[in-house]
Amino acid sequence: MIELPKDKSIAQRCAVLNLDFDERFIGEDVKNTLEAANQFAQCNEDLTLNLGNSGTGIRLLTGYIAGSGKKCTLIGDKSLSQRPMRRISDPLNTWGAQISLWEDKYPPIEIAESKLQPNFTYELEIPSAQIKSCLLLAALSSKTKIEIIENIPSRDHTERLLQECDAEIFREGNKIIFDGTKEITKKFIDVPKDFSSAAYLIAANILTNKDIPLKGIGINKTRTAFLNVLEEMGAKIELHNACIISNEPRADITARYDTYLKGVSISGQS
């Protein structure tokens, strides 16, 4: 049996939200985010948190810490220090945060003490689960309300986690409305296996025509367009034991082909 890592998108959100989950079989990015989140939760002093190479972790924690009103500096490795962060700092600063970046663009991210406005509306210029989640986590830690306009849906793991924890969050058309003033219920989260990691093995199964099942894989519809493309190419994809646990769909996946595979054209929207 092949043991795949936990879904890193969901696990990192659990780490920031301080939700319990099985910490076995997690990748380096999740470990870095978990360690940084634990350090922040246990200390009220001015901190410097190292996120290693976790772009997701540094963006999620920036939102959560900015909302908390505490002072903190977030750093990363050489690669992470070259990734732009204005897409999260700009909306947070408009909301009332005080965040500065190196060369006004890159980490280190310095967060000063501040207080966010009680109500905030933001329209996402591009589909981005990280920007959306950063703002939702800021609303939670600041106990404020936010309305996010999302014209093109992105990964909804943060919304699902908040719903699982009894938060008052819902979608109304293209709007996500979240009342962060209400306390959430901390629960154990059963994190599914990582679909992105499974994708390589799904492809290998098809290429070798092996029918080896991959068990407990997350099949959130915002993540599985890859399966649609494979089926269009002629692969036979089957989902077994599909269920929803901790508000996330999952299933065992088998993949093979019966005759031959054909080439297809895909677009960015695919």
Report residues per predicted region:
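Structural preference for solvent-exposed beta-strand-turn elements
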Residues: 1-270
